[in-house]
Amino acid sequence: MTHSLRVIFAGTPEFAAAALAAIHEAGFPVPLVLTQPDRPAGRGMKLQASAVKRYALERGMAVAQPPSLRRAGKYPAEAVAALDLLHATPHDVMVVAAYGLLLPQEVLELPRHGCINIHASLLPRWRGAAPIHRAIEAGDAETGVTLMQMDAGLDTGAMLHEARVAIAPDDTTATLHDKLAAAGARLVVDALVELERTGALAATPQPADGVTYAEKIGKHEAALDWRKPAAALARQVRAFDPFPGGAGTLDGATLKLWAADAVPGRDDAAPGTIVDIGPDGVVIACGEGALRVTQLQKPGGKRLPAREFLAGAPLAVGQRFAPADAA
């Protein structure tokens, strides 16, 4: 099936690429794709194209990669060129998903139907940069995807559609990301079909209550504070997989802890102390309960199941991870 609604797409990572793929496969014309400039990545730090750019180029779509869209910003010449291109490209709506650049008012007002954002949370909860991580970290039972009509604020626009997704007890940011990317892709296609058919989408202002912000994830957040309850640390490990992981310092070496669950602990063990080692994992005392770590990684090594890790790097009951503030 082909459609007449012309969609400019702006996005960068895999989450956005899933939406672009769904829009393209549904038959909507995409006359232009905006994505971030190529960035150094990987161990060799070679320039790599974004997931959105790779998908678009493989299908012959026009791609632009301005470092900014602000005329008065750090890259005025590049911004002006990109804005001229947007003005010269006939389109009806812009879909934005994890693009990574601020859209000035000029861009928000350019499409006939405005700019629709795909946000990976149930707004107004978890506005901001890291909604998937923060939902898991906080212990939310569910999250979802919200389509909103973009305005000048940070994820403050009126809500158009939403899809709810349960957070499974073993979900990591990686697995939940994929569920939400698929949900967002379906949601935006349904919305575009409705927009083409009816000419407008019903918009509901976000409620004033329940607003929270999902701050960007920092590498420093990997450090596990063993004084916390084991359940909170297990959520932290899941929330920070694949980045930045959970981390603990043992005898001066920083170990990455990639998979863990909360188990009953011992009252006589200081937080951070290894209280049991077995084929099922390494059990570490916490402020409340204990954390059973089932996947570990030593510096320069690979992620390994506990059994394989211990075969090459034995640990002992009684060893103690350094406090987070001393690591």
UniProtKB/Swiss-Prot annotation:
GO terms for molecular function: methionyl-tRNA formyltransferase activity. It is an enzyme of class 2 (transferase). It catalyses: L-methionyl-tRNA(fMet) + (6R)-10-formyltetrahydrofolate = N-formyl-L-methionyl-tRNA(fMet) + (6S)-5,6,7,8-tetrahydrofolate + H(+). Pfam families: Formyl_trans_C (PF02911), Formyl_trans_N (PF00551). Gene3D superfamilies: Formyl transferase, C-terminal domain (3.10.25.10), Formyl transferase, N-terminal domain (3.40.50.170). Its EC number is 2.1.2.9. InterPro entries: Fmt, Formyl_trans_C, Formyl_trans_C_sf, Formyl_transf_N, Formyl_transf_N_sf, Formyl_transferase-like_C_sf, GART_AS, Met-tRNA-FMT_C. Keywords: Protein biosynthesis, Transferase. It comes from the Bacteria. (6S)-5,6,7,8-tetrahydrofolate binds at residues 121-124. PROSITE patterns: GART. Signal peptide: none annotated. One of its GO terms (cellular component) is cytosol. NCBIfam families: fmt. Belongs to the Fmt family. Attaches a formyl group to the free amino group of methionyl-tRNA(fMet). The formyl group appears to play a dual role in the initiator identity of N-formylmethionyl-tRNA by promoting its recognition by IF2 and preventing the misappropriation of this tRNA by the elongation apparatus. This is Methionyl-tRNA formyltransferase. It comes from Burkholderia pseudomallei (strain 668). The lineage of its organism: Bacteria, Pseudomonadati, Pseudomonadota, Betaproteobacteria, Burkholderiales.
